[in-house]
Amino acid sequence: MWSLIPLTAIVLVLVAILHRLFFHPLSHVPGPFLARFSSLYLHSICYLGIEATVLRQLHIKYKTKVLRVAPNSVSISDSEAVGEIYVRGGGFPKDDRYKNFNLGPIVSIFSSLDREYRDVRAKAVAPLFSPAQLRAESGPQGVIGGCIAEFVDQLRKSKEAGIGADLMDMCARLSIDVVTGYLLGQKYGGLQENAHLPPQERQSHKLSANPFIFSIVAFSRFSLLPHRIFQFLYSTSQRLSTNDEVTESFLKLDRFTNNVLEGTTAGEKVSEKPNGGYYHERLISQAGISRMEAAAQSQAVLFAGADSTAVMLATILFHLVQNGAARSRLLCEVRSDKPQDMRFLRAVVKEGLRLGMANPTRMTRVVPKSGPGLRVGDVLLSPGTIVGCAAYNLHHDPEVFPDPFTFRPERWLDDGTDRGLRRPGMEKSMIPFGVGSRACIGKNLAQQQLHDTVVAVIDSEVLEGARTCQERIEIIEWFNADIKGHHLDIKWS
């Protein structure tokens, strides 16, 4: 009898494989052989940080807009499907993968699967992201404008001292100060953290928040795993691999957010309190959440806003260092008689967002079980299927973006100076912040910081004479993009 158990197990496995290959509702969808019956393929490329590149190549190999990447999961590289998946009727629901982005017992605004839970919190803080509110803090006396001025000044000092600068580290310092200063009312102090050190010494001292942020980004390599397995791996990893640097980084961030909630003056008060209060105050007073949750939600927005915006800003500045013609054109526009008509500035930022991708991989959703399914071209995907579009695929579609891996901001111009690069469908293929009701709540703040910083940097001419220390930016394609080596160095000649 015992000898039958292994045989029975083998038969059951073979039956499951045959079902997934030939009888599953997705059996008609092309994809790699292993991916058609096992999730191991998808987990492997996710872990290695090559998911976006591999899936793009497979879409090309199989000549399909719909690619089977796991037994019940597909990748979609058709911008026509974006509206149906993410926008109409609030979009498809998020899948269980997002539970892995919870903050321990706290469900964040981003990770919430419950729309009502998310909406109550998002609506409470939405006024902070209004364009008018952001513009008010973008002048010389505002927190956003003040942080940007300090950022440019530090770049200038590095240039005058004849030393290089790490754009990634500097942009991280700027972003964390903008996010905390504007949303929480106290700056983290990233830009001033090493101000007491000589310029040369500052190069080896990176932002204190980075070790913890990098560890969180890296753990998204496991984000596709079932939640219980993810929890086990996360807790095991915390016990085995956490080092003193990561622990100290976390403790400093934790102390900062606790100080913010306690209303202490440990951080620098940077602006008049906005109507209705700061981010954490609005969550407590208007969403009715606990102080513990408000602290966790504040840490979440700090991480999400500071890290992703830093990556995108560093990407834009990196390409501007390499593109003297773009800098010259921008300078003329910034100093023109009509600076409000910043067409080329908008084009530069858009092109940076296209290449910078804070989230390069699929933003997964579930086809509603109560609906008729999802049709993409001639392919019908049944209810319950996990679907998703990846920014990496859409942003590098050569039919929409000729020369897709090159920084060509002129492609966004509609005044006849696009050099033949402009194509229909570019706007709907751009998803740098996600789309629909679950798009990034902080995208207006990120956009304000990006536009204002580029203007200030170009107007200062601080990038003149600079060169990048590497030819191109390489990213690790986890859920959050991670720039390889965590640095983008420039030097002045």
Swiss-Prot record:
It holds the Pfam family p450. The chain crosses the membrane at residues 3-23, 301-321. It is an enzyme of class 1 (oxidoreductase). It is a multi-pass membrane protein. The keyword Transmembrane applies. Heme binds at residue 440. Its EC number is 1.-.-.-. It comes from the Eukaryota. Its cofactor is heme. Pathway: Secondary metabolite biosynthesis; terpenoid biosynthesis. It is found in: Membrane. Belongs to the cytochrome P450 family. This is Cytochrome P450 monooxygenase mfmF.
